[in-house]
Regions:
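Extended recognition/assembly regions associated with phosphoester-bond processing machinery
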Residues: 1-290
Length: 290
């Protein structure tokens, strides 16, 4: 059997961006841009200038810095879900046409906000399946759907969708909110069992789901952890994952997406990192002071 090239995951500190190095190839990965988000606020009487240019300049800076071969975006390019707002008709094509002048390989994995995204993307931008893609030992998908079965052969699953933040109160009573990275251990047999079940693969009570995956799909199950990326658009609201006022169960139910709801991801023991790389503890130690 040929040796797989090593896959290295490097957060591009202090940005909400991840560099995936697989063999000699470099993939820059970001998630949740939500272009047109501020236009939605205008409907509520709050007027915020368009963030598109700021986000574009920031992304171009990161591309110049790390010189990736390819840019992968884990979904939620635009903000409105089904229909397309006027601002998105304008901003989404401009955003990607400018990016294509910097980098010729761009892959988009659609998120739940990306209905009809194809019509907004210029030629040259590849739209991948919602069930995700494999880059070396990393499986990438947005997080609102089940991943493709082949992603179970990756050591690390990487999703967006949740926009994780932590919130603390300082001694003066001020609230501080920071975007964070989440890296949670996975219970592999449970994840394999629930994914196979989703794809209607029949399992008897004492079947070993990992054996079935090997036998029926020729996939060696390898998933060990799941990474939740911070949103690239830092202007958005986030999900304070350390809220103590409601029970953990409620928070977990609130974690939208079938993989997080399946009970196979141990969020209690998830490691939480700030964007500058500081490890601030595991989630069960980070209750918010209220
Ligand atoms: Mn989403």
């Amino acid at each position: 059997m040929s040796e797989e090239p090593r896959t290295l995951l490097k957060p591009v500190s202090p940005y909400p961006a991840l560099l995936i190095e697989s063999g000699s190839e470099k993939f820059l990965t970001i998630s949740d841009i939500h272009l047109g988000w501020e236009a939605n606020l205008a409907g509520e009487g709050v007027h915020v200038p368009s963030q598109t240019n700021k986000l574009l300049r920031r992304l171009e800076r990161i591309i110049s810095l790390v010189k990736p071969d390819c840019l992968t975006i884990l979904g939620d390019i635009k903000h409105t879900i089904e229909k397309i707002e006027l601002e998105e008709w304008r901003d989404v094509p401009i955003f990607f046409e400018s990016l294509l002048r910097k980098i010729s390989c761009i892959k988009v994995i659609p998120g739940n906000h990306d209905g009809n995204i194809e019509v907004l993307l210029p030629e040259g931008v590849e739209v991948a399946p919602q069930q995700g893609i494999v880059i070396g030992g990393a499986g990438l998908f947005h997080g609102h759907t089940w991943p493709d079965i082949k992603l179970l052969g990756c050591e690390t699953l990487i999703i967006g969708h949740i926009h994780p933040t932590v919130t603390f109160k300082d001694p003066m009573g001020f609230r501080i909110t920071s975007q964070v990275w989440v890296r949670a251990p996975c219970d592999r047999p449970t994840l394999v069992r629930s994914t196979l079940k989703h794809y209607n693969v029949r399992l008897k009570r004492d079947d070993d789901p990992e054996e079935i995956l090997r036998a029926k799909f020729s996939i060696e199950p390898k998933v060990r952890s799941l990474i939740v990326m911070p949103s690239f658009n830092d202007f958005l609201g986030g999900r304070a994952i350390n809220r103590a006022s409601i029970s953990r169960d409620v928070i977990f139910k609130d974690f939208i997406g079938p993989v997080l709801r399946s009970g196979s991801v141990d969020l209690e023991r998830a490691e939480i990192y700030l964007l500058d790389g500081t490890f601030i503890g595991t989630l069960n130690k980070l209750s918010m002071l209220e």
